[in-house]
Design a protein with these regions (language model features):
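Glycoside hydrolase catalytic-domain context in secreted enzymes
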Residues: 1-178
Length: 178
């Protein structure tokens, strides 16, 4: 069984819409709590979809392609730390990507985020799921599958799969994701 938790983001500002769900403004503290939560749940037979990877800081307009900006140093030293600790120390086998864009790229279709950092650098072997369904048109599911990072499309209809299954590249990427 799975659990959509813990929320591993850091508090980026005092008015963020999900601060009640996230542990702290300190990446190390949030990471330690996330790793302990994930480790305990995994030991008891439950996998945790650590969420919302990454930089999920606002609820307002997040469904409309909110762009979140941070430089690579800040992302690696602060905002990625809770997720990295949950993967490396807690043994997480499931991640939920965030709604927002990081820069101009939707997090769920970011090869840099989901393949290069999560899978290649941290050694994550597991499932990445999108955060709910695409209701407002900014999530490009074909790009998410083709980017190679997203395995499960939360709440998506069959039209997306029909479109992807009609191309050789789409078929290959869906097989790799499975």
């Amino acid at each position: 069984s799975g659990w959509y938790a813990p929320g591993a983001n850091t508090h980026r500002n005092a008015f963020a819409g999900r601060n009640f769900e996230y542990y702290s403004e300190d990446g190390f503290l949030s990471g330690s709590m996330s790793a302990a939560t994930v480790g305990a749940a995994e030991k008891n037979g439950m996998y945790c979809y650590i969420k919302h990877f990454a930089l999920n800081e606002r609820e307002t307009w997040r469904h409309y392609g909110l762009c979140t900006w941070a430089d690579e140093q800040a992302m690696r030293e602060i905002y990625f730390v809770p997720f990295e600790k949950a993967v490396k120390e807690g043994g997480s086998t499931a991640v939920m990507s965030s709604y927002n864009n990081i820069g101009t790229t939707w997090a769920g279709a970011s090869t840099a985020l989901l393949t290069n950092v999560l899978r290649n650098e941290w050694g994550f072997i597991g499932t990445v799921i999108t955060d709910n369904n695409e209701e407002h048109g900014f999530m490009d599911i074909e790009k998410a599958v083709l980017a190679g990072g997203t395995n499960l499309l939360f709440g998506w209809g069959t039209k997306t799969f029909d479109n992807l299954s009609q191309t050789a590249t789409g078929q290959l990427k869906m097989r790799e994701a499975a």
